[in-house]
Design a protein with these regions (language model features):
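Histidine/acidic residue-rich metal-binding segments in metalloenzymes
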Residues: 116, 145-215
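Active-site mouth loops of central-metabolism enzymes
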Residues: 63-75, 139-146, 188-192
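Divalent metal-dependent hydrolysis catalytic cores, especially in the metallo-beta-lactamase
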Residues: 62, 78-107, 120-133, 160-171, ...
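Divalent metal-coordination and catalytic microenvironments
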Residues: 8, 22, 27, 49, ...
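Short amphipathic alpha-helices and their capping/turn segments at secondary-structure boundaries
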Residues: 40-48, 107-119, 199-206
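Generic structural signal for well-ordered alpha-helices
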Residues: 81, 105-112, 153, 179
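Histidine-rich, glycine-flanked metal-binding segment
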Residues: 1-4, 10-53
Length: 216
């Protein structure tokens, strides 16, 4: 279905566009212009000068609306995702705190299933841990924190293509090898819950780490 929003203040990469229009087909943006001329065949929505912005992409989210992604169930995933979809989020990376392998696999199975649905808002799974610095655990579960182990993470990565981001503390033994491996598989490596110094971060960058999570 073709839809056109007119008479809107639109946020674009170049700034705000006043009195513009947004043309969409099946909820996908086709065109943004500063012309309010109606497109033949489109359902018109008059924004009456209100703001129109692209949908939010939630890259770090542990749950919502009473649903916790750590539960790993479809019910928990859908509850949390629907809660965020009601408030402007259109894409989401469900996030797990430090978990056991069975917990990761349960969530990965659910995530894979939801990603396969038409027009799914789920873009992939984010693992915040469990290869973190114990001294910087914060709200993480310390009993699940450990050093990177290729005998553990390689089978996980090979089995679950839904994993798109994985966080680690680069000062841990084996963390550089871990970063090189996962980035070679197309997974974003992020520095997190760490006591890394400058040289550690520099080495991490050279080993594929390109993002940061929870520095404190």
């Amino acid at each position: 279905m073709l839809t056109q929003i007119i008479n809107a203040k639109i946020l674009t990469p170049q700034g705000w566009l006043k009195d513009g229009s947004v043309l969409m087909r099946d909820n996908k943006i086709l065109e943004v212009t500063n012309c309010d001329l109606a497109v033949i065949g489109a359902e018109l929505i008059d924004a009456k000068g209100m703001y129109v912005v692209p949908g939010g992409v939630e890259i770090h989210c542990h749950g919502g609306g009473g649903g916790d992604f750590m539960e790993g169930t479809e019910e928990a995933f859908r509850t949390a995702i629907n809660a965020h979809m009601k408030h402007g989020t259109t894409s989401i990376f469900p996030t797990l705190s430090s978990s056991t392998v069975p917990m990761i696999e349960a969530a990965a199975e659910t995530c894979t299933r939801l990603m396969a649905e038409p027009d799914s808002p789920v873009l992939g799974l984010h693992l915040e841990g469990h290869y973190l610095n114990m001294k910087m655990a914060g709200g993480q579960m310390p009993e699940n924190i450990k050093d990177p182990d290729p005998k553990e993470y390689i089978p996980i990565v090979e089995k679950w293509g839904c994993i798109k981001r994985w966080d680690a503390a680069p000062e841990l033994p084996g963390a550089m090898q871990f970063g090189k491996y996962i980035t070679g598989k197309g997974i974003l490596a992020s520095v997190a819950h760490t006591q890394a110094e400058y040289e550690d971060i520099r080495a991490a960058w050279e080993s594929g780490y390109s993002h940061a999570t929870h520095f404190y």
